């Protein structure tokens, strides 16, 4: 009788293990703690001001689900996500938020640090203007609520959002 119970237990455990769902094809990817999932990517806001290059280097340290970069923005919805993340934590009435767009390699040819195509922009009126050799893009918050993009010196320190793709 003990043999029969042991056999039933082994079979039951075996069937239970075989019936576990394989999430690799249907379960949504998960982001690390403190990251926000949206449309196949993970995002995280960092409020400590860094220069553009420092912020990009910090983002590249994150590799939990894909290589991290300063956030690229492909749509108005994604732009609004970043604005919402920023507005929910910012404490000043003016300031900026680094995004992963720059024309450091060639003036006027803006590229995303993650290599994705530039398919959406939200430049403020008269921007980008390259005033005093500005090569890096940030979301600019103005008192009038015009939270749009501006090119600015890469040496300035701003908060930033990192983005990791979950599809790599």
Curated annotation (Swiss-Prot):
Task: List the Gene3D superfamilies.
Answer: Mannose-Binding Protein A, subunit A (3.10.100.10)
For this chain, the annotated S-S bridges are 59-162, 136-154
Keywords attached to this Swiss-Prot or TrEMBL record, sorted alphabetically, are:
Disulfide bond, Hemagglutinin, Lectin, Signal
Q: Name one GO molecular function term.
A: carbohydrate binding
Domain of life, per lineage: Eukaryota
User: Is Manganese tagged as a keyword?
Assistant: no
* C-type lectin domain: residues covered: 38-163
* Pfam families membership: Lectin_C
Instruction: Read off the InterPro entries from this record.
Output: C-type_lectin-like, C-type_lectin-like/link_sf, C-type_lectin/snaclec_domain, C-type_lectin_CS, CEL1-like_CTLD, CTDL_fold
> Is Disulfide bond a UniProt keyword of this protein?
yes
Q: Where is the signal peptide?
A: 1-18
Job description of the protein = Alpha-N-acetylgalactosamine-specific lectin. The oligomeric form has Ca(2+)-dependent hemagglutination activity towards sheep erythrocytes. Its hemagglutination activity is inhibited by various monosaccharides, oligosaccharides and glycopeptides, including inhibition by GalNAc, blood group A trisaccharide, Tn antigen, mucin and asialomucin.
- Note the subunit structure: Monomer, homodimer and homooligomer.
**The name this protein goes by in its record:** Alpha-N-acetylgalactosamine-specific lectin
Supply the source organism for this entry. Patiria pectinifera
């Amino acid at each position: 009788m003990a043999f029969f119970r042991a056999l039933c237990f082994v079979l039951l455990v075996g069937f239970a293990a075989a019936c576990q769902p394989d999430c690799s094809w249907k379960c949504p990817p998960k982001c690390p703690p403190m990251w926000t999932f949206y449309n196949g990517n993970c995002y995280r806001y960092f409020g400590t001001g860094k220069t553009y290059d420092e912020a990009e280097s910090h983002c590249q340290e994150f590799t939990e689900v894909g290589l991290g970069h300063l956030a690229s923005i492909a749509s108005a919805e994604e732009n609004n996500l970043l604005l919402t993340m920023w507005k929910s934590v910012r404490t000043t009435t003016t300031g900026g938020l680094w995004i992963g767009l720059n024309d450091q390699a060639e003036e006027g040819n803006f590229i995303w640090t993650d290599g994705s195509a530039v398919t959406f922009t939200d430049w403020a009126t008269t921007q980008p203007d390259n005033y005093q050799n500005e090569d890096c893009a940030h979301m600019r918050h103005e008192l009038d609520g015009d939270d749009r993009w501006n090119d600015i010196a890469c040496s300035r320190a701003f908060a930033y959002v990192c983005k990791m793709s979950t599809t790599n």
